[in-house]
Every structure is written in structure tokens, then in C-alpha cells.
Amino acid sequence: MYNIYGAAGSGSVAIEAVLELMEVPYQVLVEAPTWEGEAERAKVTPVNPMAQLPVLVTTQGEVITESAAILLWLTEQHPEANLAPKPGCATRAQFLRWMSFIPAAIYSMYWVRDEPERIAGDNKAVYPELLQRTADRVAHCWHVMDSQLTPQLFLLGQQMSVLDIYVTVASRWTPGRRRFYQVAPGMAEVVRRVDGLVQLKDFWARRFPFNTDWDG
């Protein structure tokens, strides 16, 4: 069984959702909303010195951090789930491109947003502008990604991949779905489709309940 260090509404939800689709046993061993402060981060530092989520501990006890790395590793361990283009497949390069883009360009903004003092120190007067600029940056990145894709049923074609799950979870965070739908109309129907997957209905309700305010 896989063990996860995670939190409801966090990046671990993408990992958990993929494991649900794969029908692979797992448990959230430690629930730690790290954005709530040092006490929560202290629950994670024994396995990740960066004190960040998610963390996956394999059945052999190996620790894997970084959401994209975990998702890619899981697709290699469970190829029968068919949640990633195979090496040599026509969509493989774009799959790897966007799986890397999300943590590099988008996910990283939330380290700043969760606690603006990490960048601005005690100068609280600049917090609102910092939050606005990071939200604008996230929206711009979604727009860039949308402009480079031609989704079908899913982002890369007719077959769902972990990329679809990754985008569905990350697009629920600030600046939220309303703006996401505005700047990324091509991806909008895909994330709505993943929101509505029957296989994940109970899971979403438990780990990242749908908020009607997301819809524009």
C-alpha cells in the first residue's frame, strides 16, 4: 500500500485521484495542511525537508516528493491504467512538456501566495499587490497552455492522462475556475468533464468538494 502525506484541497489530491482511478491501495498516512503554519509543516519535514506536499512513500519505503515526479512514476509503475502516453507516442513530448510546465510555472506561485511574508517580509502593505500579481501570473500561464493545446475529449486527445487530473486540481486554486474558464476556454470543457467523472464523484466530495462559485 502507498502512504501519502497530504491534505484535502492540496496538491496531494491529484495523486490520490490518480490512485483512485488506478484502483491501487493507498492511505493518507499524515494529513498536514502545511499552509496553516509551522506545526503542520513539522509533520512533513521528517520525509521532506522542504516541508511541502505531496509526499508518497512506496511499498518499499522509498520517499518520492514533487507532484509531477510522483504522477509520472505512478504511470510507469501501473502502465495497465493507461494514464500516460507511451514513450514514442505522438503525444508523449507534449505530455512531458505540460507535466513539467505546471509545477515550474504555476504550482510555484502558491509557495508565495500561501504566505506572502516569505517574499515581502513584514511589509504587509504590499501583500495585496503580491497576491494580485501572482494570481495574474497563474492566469497568464493557463492562457499560454491553452493557446498551445487543441483538446478533444481530454487535453491530449481521446485518452485521459494524469495531465488531465493535474490541471483539474490545480485550476481549482486561486484565481479560481471563473478566471480559468475565461483565459483557458479550450481546456474548460476538459476540466468540467474530469470534475464529473463517475469514478471520482465520492472522492471529490471527500477530498476537494466542488464549489459552485468556481463556475463563471
What does each of the following model-derived ranges do?
Residues P33-T34, M160, P209-F210:
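Positions that flank functional sites
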Residues L200-G216:
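Terminal-tail/helix-coil boundary detector
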Residues M1-E129:
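GST-like domain detector, emphasizing the conserved glutathione-binding G-site
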Residues P46, G196, A205:
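Phosphate-coordinating loops and pocket residues in cytosolic domains that bind phosphorylated ligands
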Residues A69, G186, Q199:
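Residue-level recognition of oxygen-bearing side chains
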Residues M99-G196:
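GST-like fold's C-terminal all-alpha helical module
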Residues T75, A170-S171, W204:
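Active-site-flanking alpha-helical
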Residues P54-V57, L155, K201:
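Short beta-strand(s) of the beta-wing in winged-helix/HTH DNA-binding folds
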